[in-house]
Amino acid sequence: ISTNPGASTSHSINRPTYSLQDVDGDGYLDIVESEKESELKVTRSAIGRTNMLKSVTNSLGGTFTLDYAHTTPTYGLPGGKWVMSALTVDDGIHDDGPVMTTAFEYKDGKRDRHEREFLGFGEVITKNLDTENGNSVYRQAVENYDVANYYTQGNVTATSVEDANGNKYTETKNRYDSYYLTADGDKYTFAKRDVNLWSDRASAFVPLRYTANLQYEGAANGVVTSEAWNEYYLNGYHGELKSYKYSDKGSLGEDGNGKFDYATAIKYTDNASKHIFDFLLM
């Protein structure tokens, strides 16, 4: 009689103890370490502003100094972006006024996931600082951009000059039209779109249609001081400027059908046999 009893057991746990991850969202990899489940150690990347221009000095002793910051990552702009946050200008002559410092703020950054391209920031605020009074803001310029899609990126929708509390002095508003266009030889066909442009294959034309300048000067509502309206040659042409209307009475309107002070009509000539177009005729 022979008996050979036996038993076997094993137990194993696998987990990473070291990895490279962007923990703080600054666009650079950090070192992440963990020797036990209750502890996590992060060594942050120190690259930051490395190799970004810091200052320039001219032959007369004047300098300008740049500073940078990383924007907060958002759904629209994952990972954020390194941007210029401040500019200090010193002309080297200190008896003619204080050093000038300008700070910059960026909002509504957009990265198009489909195009894999950065479309810009929806709002950029340029702040003039009082360097003799604790760097307090005394004036700011606000610029708004259309970052809705690839075709409209970079179009300025509004600009304004404001005081430190956001009360406007002046404002400019822009309105654009949107067209899909198709080409038949040298002739284009334009199809107007009133919604966001979106296509993998189509070409688009997004011209400036209307501009209004407003004056506030402390009031809650602005007064229109001037307007401009543009019309373009479309089907059968190439989107050339056709006419321009101007009014300083505030009566023109976004459709261009109101009263105006003067209008300019533009005509072009071409040499179609040689595919040469858009020569200004009058």
Spans of model-derived segments:
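Non-catalytic interaction/targeting regions
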Residues: 1-282
